[in-house]
A protein has these predicted regions:
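Short glycine-cluster motifs
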Residues: 153-208, 254-255, 300-377, 381-384, ...
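ATP-dependent carboxylate activation and anion-phosphoryl transfer catalytic cores
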Residues: 265, 278-281, 392, 396-397, ...
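Rossmann-fold NAD(P) dinucleotide-binding segment
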Residues: 66-70, 83-106, 392-399
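Gly-rich Lys/Arg/Thr-decorated short loops/hinges at beta-loop-alpha junctions or inter-strand turns
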Residues: 14-18, 72-73, 101-102, 155-158, ...
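Peripheral docking tails and interdomain loops at the edges
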Residues: 97, 106-145, 149-157, 246-314, ...
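General beta-strand structural signal in soluble alpha/beta enzymes
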Residues: 49-50, 100-102, 126, 131-136, ...
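Hydrophobic, well-ordered beta-alpha structural blocks that scaffold small-molecule cofactor pockets
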Residues: 1-44, 49
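ATP-grasp fold ATP-binding core
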Residues: 303-306, 471-495, 504-529, 533, ...
Length: 690
């Protein structure tokens, strides 16, 4: 292990712990933390209470400061008012205490003064290389070392799920809920303000933690977007990462000036980043742990889904959910159908209904037969509490068959099923109570499996002279910028007079398109500053009309002329855009283009740089993909050319961080083999709009 990993290992497996702010007063944070540590068992050699007001607490000698303690201290837990924390951190540095949990609140979360105090904390940590969890956090738990360094009252069971939470209150609620649900954890970390240690530090540690099979996270933001994606990609090679992210709506977000800016926001950036990094996203506490529990025992489904039920209604619910989720309700092999026939079922095709009067053995036999089918990758076993069913016996069937093929039990009911449910939990098998929950959990497995296939593909690189391009960017030669990256554009020229417009049009050939060039006029079509299918006789008049309209909208000095462009007729219109996200960098968008992009909002998002798979997925994820693929006898569009533009534009956005927003709209794509053209574009850089 690296030095950082060794330090974090000591954080989770300390031999000696000091509680700064320990107190005999019941209900106080320092009292609860000390009690929890004392109740942790024999894992700790020494526990030190630190508080200058007392001589003894909980039978322990109480020290006035860390400096008075003889011997090593592996971990200090600080629970005192915020203003006293910097002084204690200096004591930690003097005593060689590398790992610190700052429970104390009153830092950046309370405003300006707290932010200054947190800056001081960070400065001390950097100067002395301290690992600090928090501040403003619940603490940490390592169930496999019997360590509970939190002020929570509930101790979770041991398990293989690590849980990182940015909210201490959320973590407390989850721990309490998990105790009732019998969900076990390996490690729990309340991240707090993430002043020093953030989610990435713990993800890197948990990647190598033998006690952890799955990482579940509750996040409000990420510290460094690109680093977060890089770390999660590495972790998710072997361990699923399930994230519940709060704030995933954009109500009240301000409209930005470009099409992309008005649609894209942090929600889209997070969702794109999660998909690209291999994260399985959950939208509720229930999903967070349903998905985590399922992924802790199933990470691949080798085939379609089978349903075996003793009740038609729940079976139909499961079948509907499977279709809606994009999973496959598999067709059985002929041999399976023949084996099922003697059981006299309501039906012997998928989903199998063994009927409400079926015995447990009949249900178990059907399960066993289906499990032998080569087309079946997982089975959803649904049981309602009918009179003939013995749930404990049914649970034994599930456990036996699960050893050969994944079985997802849906034992529906309350008190009647609880004995069997508890026994299943002891063997690491969760019950889902609701067929839809079971299907969603299998979809999470499939999503994880699919993302494993492509999450590690490196982005392609195109050779471009960026030095020359920067000079063109300075002179606002935007089309030249696209051209340099190999992005196809129509022939064009910039005209400052009507005669120049005619000369350019003669060279290009007719008809032509003509558009105003002004940083103040963004949506040119809306204000009549675009002329299409212009023939030779109309070039000069079109020039004058465009200029007149433009001068009504802005000053003459802000009009740079008129763009005269080869007229590209036909094709289907799409848009490629970019907005630079403050967490993740360039957020790319693809969708249905033209003037209706904001009406239909048929778009998909990814973070640059894109891999080939990312680019293809962006196109496939929009509803209009069927149109691009060809419908009602229409030829398929040249999707490969759009993939090429996405990849080249992705590299452009990465290499030019001063471009804040961009729209390539419309892009006209033609039938397969005939390519595409960027007909119009807009870019907003740190210094200009063009």
């Amino acid at each position: 292990m690296s030095t950082k990993e060794e330090m974090l290992d000591k954080l989770f497996n300390p031999r000696t712990v000091a509680v700064v702010g320990a107190t005999p007063k019941e209900g106080k944070v320092g009292n609860t933390i000390l009690k929890n540590l004392l109740a942790s068992g024999t894992g700790l050699l020494s526990i030190y209470a630190v508080n200058p007001r007392y001589d003894r607490i909980q039978g322990l000698k109480c020290y006035p400061s860390l400096s008075e303690i003889q011997g090593d201290i592996d971990l200090a837990v600080i629970a005192i008012p915020a203003e006293g924390v910097p002084n204690v951190l200096e004591q930690c540095a003097e005593r060689g205490v590398e790992n610190v949990v700052v429970i104390s609140a009153g830092f950046k979360e309370v405003g300006r003064e707290g932010a200054v105090l947190e800056s001081e904390l960070i400065k001390i940590a950097k100067e002395h290389k301290l690992n600090i969890v928090g501040p403003n956090c619940l603490g940490i738990i390592n169930t496999h070392a019997n360590l509970n360094a939190t002020f929570g009252k509930t101790v979770p069971d041991k398990g293989s799920i690590a849980f990182l939470s940015q909210s201490g209150a959320f973590a407390l609620a989850v721990i309490d809920w998990a105790k009732v649900a019998r969900v076990g954890f390996s490690k729990i970390v309340s991240l707090g303000n993430k002043a020093v240690l953030d989610e990435c530090h713990f993800l890197e540690y948990l990647d190598k933690d033998p006690d952890t099979a799955v990482v579940a996270m509750y996040l409000e933001d990420v510290s460094e977007g690109s680093r977060f994606m890089r770390v999660v990609r590495e972790v998710s090679r072997t361990k699923p990462v399930v994230v519940m992210k709060s704030g995933m709506t954009e109500a009240g977000a301000k409209a930005a000036s470009s099409h992309t800016g008005s649609i894209a926001g942090s929600v889209e950036a997070y969702r794109a980043a999660f998909a690209q990094a291999g994260i399985v996203e959950a939208t509720s506490i229930q999903e967070l742990f349903d998905f985590s529990l399922t992924l802790s025992r199933i990470q691949r489904i080798k085939g379609g889904i089978a349903i075996v039920t003793n009740s038609g209604g729940p079976g139909v619910m499961a079948a509907d959910a499977i279709e809606e989720s994009g999973l496959e309700l598999t067709a059985f092999e002929r041999e399976t159908m023949e084996k099922l026939h003697p059981l006299q079922l309501a039906n012997s095709y998928n989903p199998i209904d063994v009927r409400g009067d079926a015995t447990t053995d009949k249900f178990g036999t059907a399960l066993s037969i289906v499990a032998e089918d080569g087309y079946v990758g997982a089975i959803i076993a649904i049981l309602s509490p009918t009179a003939p069913i013995e749930f404990d016996k049914a649970g034994n069937y599930v456990m036996a068959i699960n050893a050969k093929k994944p079985v997802i039990p849906v034992f529906m009911g309350g008190e009647t099923v609880m004995s069997a449910v508890e026994e299943l939990k002891k063997h690491g098998i969760a019950n889902y109570f609701d067929p839809v929950r079971a299907v969603k959990s299998l979809k999470a497995v499939k999503d994880y499996e699919e993302r494993q296939k492509r999450v590690f593909e490196p982005p392609p690189h195109f050779n471009v002279d960026t030095g020359q391009i920067r000079e063109q960017l300075r002179h606002k030669l935007g089309f030249e910028l696209l051209k340099a990256y190999g992005i196809p554009i129509p022939a064009y020229g910039k005209a400052e007079t009507a005669d120049e417009a005619l000369d350019i049009a003669d060279k290009i050939g007719y008809p032509v398109a003509m558009k105003i060039l002004s940083p103040d006029i963004i949506h040119k079509t809306d204000v009549g500053c675009v002329k299409l299918n212009v023939n030779r006789e109309a070039v000069k008049e079109s020039f004058f009309e465009i200029m007149r309209r433009g001068e009504k909208l802005t000053t003459a000095r802000r009009i740079e002329g008129v763009l005269v462009q080869q007229m590209i007729a036909g094709g289907k219109e799409v848009i490629i855009g970019m907005k630079r996200d403050r967490h993740f960098g360039p957020l790319l968008m693809f969708g249905l283009g033209g003037i209706y992009v904001e009406v239909f909002r048929d778009v998909s998002f990814r973070i640059a740089p894109l891999s080939m798979s990312d680019a293809k997925e962006m196109i496939k994820n929009v509803r209009a993909y069927r149109i691009l693929h060809g419908v009602r006898g229409e030829p398929m569009s040249d999707i490969d050319s759009l993939v090429n533009v996405l990849l080249r534009f992705s590299q452009l956005c990465v290499e030019f961080p001063d471009i804040l927003e961009a729209d390539l709209n419309p892009i006209k794509v033609f039938e397969y083999g005939k390519g595409c053209y960027v007909v119009d574009f807009k870019m907003i850089s740190t210094n200009s709009v063009f």
